[in-house]
């Protein structure tokens, strides 16, 4: 057991205790969902600036009908009018 690799020990534990398979599946699903949500926040959020030289204020380039929220229940972004100045 001391020389066994991590994968072999993991497989042995799953073989001995098959009840932990759903728990491992749910943990993997949760970790995958969290990683995808962080990726979405990093790529779609107007507050994140990856290139400070070419685009120092990315939130100024958003038009009023750009939906950047994850879920907008009562707002129809297609009908909004522009109410701010251009920079």
UniProtKB/Swiss-Prot annotation:
Pfam families named in the record = B12D
Gene Ontology, cellular component aspect: mitochondrion; respiratory chain complex IV
Q: Do you know which InterPro entries this protein is assigned to?
A: B12D
Tree of life domain:
Eukaryota
Q: Per the database entry, which stretches of residues form a coiled coil?
A: none
- Family membership noted in the UniProt record: Belongs to the complex I NDUFA4 subunit family.
Q: What is this protein called?
A: NADH dehydrogenase [ubiquinone] 1 alpha subcomplex subunit 4-like 2
* Origin species: Homo sapiens (Human)
């Amino acid at each position: 057991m001391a020389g066994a690799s991590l994968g072999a020990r993991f497989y042995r534990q799953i073989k001995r205790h098959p009840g932990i398979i759903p728990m491992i599946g749910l943990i993997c699903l949760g970790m995958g969902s969290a990683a995808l949500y962080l990726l979405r926040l990093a790529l779609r959020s107007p507050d994140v600036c990856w290139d400070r030289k070419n685009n120092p204020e990315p939130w100024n380039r958003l038009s009023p009908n750009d939906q950047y929220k994850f879920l907008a229940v009562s707002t129809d972004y297609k009908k909004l009018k522009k109410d701010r100045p251009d920079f």
